Design a protein with these regions (language model features):
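Intrinsically disordered, low-complexity regulatory regions of eukaryotic transcription factors
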Residues: 1-22
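Extended amphipathic coiled-coil helices
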Residues: 20, 26-195
Length: 195
């Protein structure tokens, strides 16, 4: 009986040792799958556009201007910006968000990737530039919509609402609030998938 008990203990010990070795292999394999942000930005996204080139290439149309008038500044500008980003392949985009909760944004500018400041200065500049491109469409809208300047015309109401919304926030407090909302929407659509 002692010999039989002894053999069982040896067998159980070997099973435990085999299980431990197997667990170590699994553990080691999972460590090899860590995400490297610098590699993603500098290698995978090395051909991404610069933020200024992205804004210049963004093709806004009268529908974008009208959307700002209908939905408001935040929704309209967010839609135009995100639509432009979504039209690009992920590795060609000039903006990536590495942490949605903290809104950590990385922007390619002057051919190098940089983390945007805590105030999101580069992204705010890009948002203002997109907003200005939108405002420039007001003249085209006027030409295609005669009667916009007549008080009793329905087009006048549409034009005035569109113009007010296209101009953006009226003061610094509203600007900070609206830009914060736009940045959150951009961040949600540019979050890096860490697969």
């Amino acid at each position: 009986q002692t010999l039989e008990l002894s053999n069982k203990l040896v067998d159980q010990g070997q099973m435990v040792n085999n299980g431990t070795i197997h667990n170590n292999n699994t553990s080691n394999n999972s460590h090899n799958k860590t995400f490297n942000l610098n590699f993603f930005l500098n290698e995978t996204c090395k051909d991404a556009m610069n933020i200024t080139d992205f804004v210049k290439s963004l093709q806004l149309n009268l529908q974008d201007l009208e959307r700002v008038g209908e939905l408001g500044y935040v929704e309209g500008i967010s839609h135009a910006f995100v639509k432009g980003l979504n039209d690009l392949e992920v590795h060609k985009r000039p903006i990536h968000c590495s942490d949605l909760k903290r809104e950590i944004i990385h922007i390619k500018d002057k051919d190098k990737w940089e983390r945007d400041t805590t105030n999101q200065d580069k992204l705010k500049r890009a948002i203002k530039d997109v907003s200005n491109k939108n405002i420039m469409l007001l003249d085209d809208w006027q030409k295609k919509n005669p009667g916009y300047d007549k008080y009793n015309d329905r087009k006048n109401d549409i034009y005035l609402k569109m113009m007010v919304q296209a101009m953006g926030p009226a003061d610094h407090i509203a600007e900070k609030r609206d830009f914060g909302k736009i940045i959150r929407r951009i961040a949600k659509n540019t979050i890096i998938e860490k697969e």
